[in-house]
């Protein structure tokens, strides 16, 4: 069985990223490459990471006018990512364009509410209601726009799964029971997230900042 854990690679250094991924490759199901990595290493870096044989989750959280996002995704198609993220807040037309131009084997996933945000943060940017309310609303939009799923915290995934049984749900910000929270605000344990309906988990610092990343990955995997 393939592990649902995707390792978050948050470093600009390609050599360090490759070394880390090689250490844990047998205990994770894929690699999530974010803005920091992509801005430093571009297409070349993604190709190098893909040589390890793990699915690539390209987490660029694209958010712009529909035409610009569509052209950006067309430029990314040669990378053949297994998963690609866009911001749900970009609107229906942007989401529809994103899915229309993505490769047939790429899941296009909508980011709903970042796990670093809580209700006061949403109020600061003019959004009323709770993060849960916003996630449910944006999940419905993503589904209607034809996307494959959403990114949400473990606190909302149960409701999202109930409303969208066939959706693909990415849950970041998970922390082992004894793990440090850091800058995350809406967290659950990996086991709870999977029990509530997550499709895959994004795990970064609990593995990458461990003195033994492979052991950390195995310990998290053992709880699932």
UniProtKB/Swiss-Prot annotation:
Pfam families: OMPdecase
Protein name per its UniProtKB record: Orotidine 5'-phosphate decarboxylase
Active site per database record: 61
Reaction catalysed by this enzyme: orotidine 5'-phosphate + H(+) = UMP + CO2
One annotated Gene Ontology cellular component of this protein: cytosol
EC number annotated for this UniProt entry: 4.1.1.23
GO terms of molecular function: orotidine-5'-phosphate decarboxylase activity
Subunit: Homodimer.
Organism of provenance: Sphingopyxis alaskensis (strain DSM 13593 / LMG 18877 / RB2256)
Keyword Lyase in annotation: yes
Alphabetical keyword list: Decarboxylase, Lyase, Pyrimidine biosynthesis
Protein family: Belongs to the OMP decarboxylase family. Type 1 subfamily.
Pathway the protein takes part in: Pyrimidine metabolism; UMP biosynthesis via de novo pathway; UMP from orotate: step 2/2
Role according to the record: Catalyzes the decarboxylation of orotidine 5'-monophosphate (OMP) to uridine 5'-monophosphate (UMP).
GO biological process: 'de novo' pyrimidine nucleobase biosynthetic process; 'de novo' UMP biosynthetic process
